[in-house]
From Swiss-Prot:
Top enzyme class: transferase
GO CC annotation, single: membrane
Name of the protein described by the UniProt record: RING-H2 finger protein ATL32
Alphabetical list of CDD domains matching this protein: RING-H2_EL5-like
Enzyme nomenclature, EC number: 2.3.2.27
């Protein structure tokens, strides 16, 4: 039996090798990594947009820092803005009307400093600064709290309550002596009586009450604060005046009072020495009263009467010295 021997065919081997090479190249192309731009997903357009956004963010930060720096260098600018908006008579955002705000009395703090009840210095509850003599202040008659005019006007632009006690400032006060619209301004100027004896009694009573409270409530070990200081928390913002002085303030409400000798009554020895010549005609041996002629800017003549009641009276005169 003869064995069949197949002949070697080189054409088949060539075709097989070519097919293997082509298959290997196809597999290599399918598994080759993509270009960097396609792999990361970044394109030149996206890079430009990102750079623009970063630049805008940086410029916005610089602008905010610049605006804050300008606001700190000129702190009164915001106050002027709110005051101008308030004076326009436009609609307020939850605040009081312009007419209501102007009805609250405005005056110099020096005009009531000597007449106030209590020896402690007053502070503004909004800025927490001590009130100076030359500063203009505004009084809230309902609660007797005193503020700088710029501070309280800015507050009342968006609020209708007192910043200290939260009293509703839109409600009219019915307390006697707070406001008397029936009394004309001319009548109030003609006759003003300040009872010094009442003021002194009130001051002594206030000092005695403070000493009693501080004696009954010693320093607390748990809080480190005394009860006297706690009870006096709002007193440093409260202006307490005699009824007559407060009536005079309400009579000229909404107007800035100038410092006048007829209102700033100061019974000191210096005033008596300066006016000794005018009072020499009225003070004699055994006399119980002495009058000092002090003409003021309102055309009033102020004289001091040292009587048993201890009162100081101001009456209108025609400018002639009293005899």
């Amino acid at each position: 039996m003869m064995t069949r021997v197949e002949c070697f065919n080189p054409h088949r081997w060539i075709i097989l090798h070519v097919a293997i090479i082509i298959q290997s190249k196809a597999n290599a192309q399918s598994f080759s990594p993509s270009p960097p731009d396609l792999q990361t997903g970044h394109t030149p357009s996206k890079t430009t947009v990102f750079a623009v956004l970063v630049t805008l963010f940086f410029l916005t930060g610089l602008l905010s820092v610049y605006i804050r720096h300008c606001a700190r260098s000129n702190p009164d600018s915001s106050t002027r803005y709110f005051r101008n908006r308030a004076n326009d008579g436009s609609s307020r955002r939850g605040g009081l009307d312009n007419a209501v705000v102007e009805s609250f009395p405005v005056f110099a703090y020096s005009s009531v400093k000597e007449s106030k009840i209590g020896s402690k210095d007053l502070e503004c509850a909004i800025c927490l600064n001590e009130l100076e003599d030359h500063e203009t202040v505004r009084l809230l008659p309902i609660c007797n709290h005193l503020f700088h005019i710029d501070c309280i006007d800015t507050w009342l632009y968006s609020h209708a309550t007192c910043p200290v006690c939260r009293s509703n400032l839109t409600a009219k006060s019915n307390k006697p002596g707070d406001e008397d619209d029936g009394v004309p301004l001319a009548a109030m100027r003609d006759h003003v009586v300040v009872d010094i004896e009442t003021v002194e009694v009130a001051k002594s009573h206030h000092r005695r009450l403070s000493s009693e409270i501080s004696g009954k409530f010693p320093r607390s070990n748990s809080t480190g604060h005394s009860m006297d200081r706690f009870s006096d928390g709002t007193e440093r913002f409260t202006l307490r005046l005699p009824d007559d002085v407060k009536m005079r303030l309400m009579a000229v409400k909404g107007r800035r009072l100038k410092r006048t000798r007829s209102f700033d009554v100061d019974l000191t020895a210096e005033h008596y020495c300066r006016s000794g010549e005018e009072s020499s005609n009225t003070i004699g041996s055994g006399a119980k009263s002495g009058r000092v002629n002090w003409p003021d800017r309102w055309g009033l003549t102020l004289f001091v009467s040292k009587s048993n009641s201890g009162s100081v009276r101001s009456q209108k005169s025609n400018g002639e010295p009293l005899k």
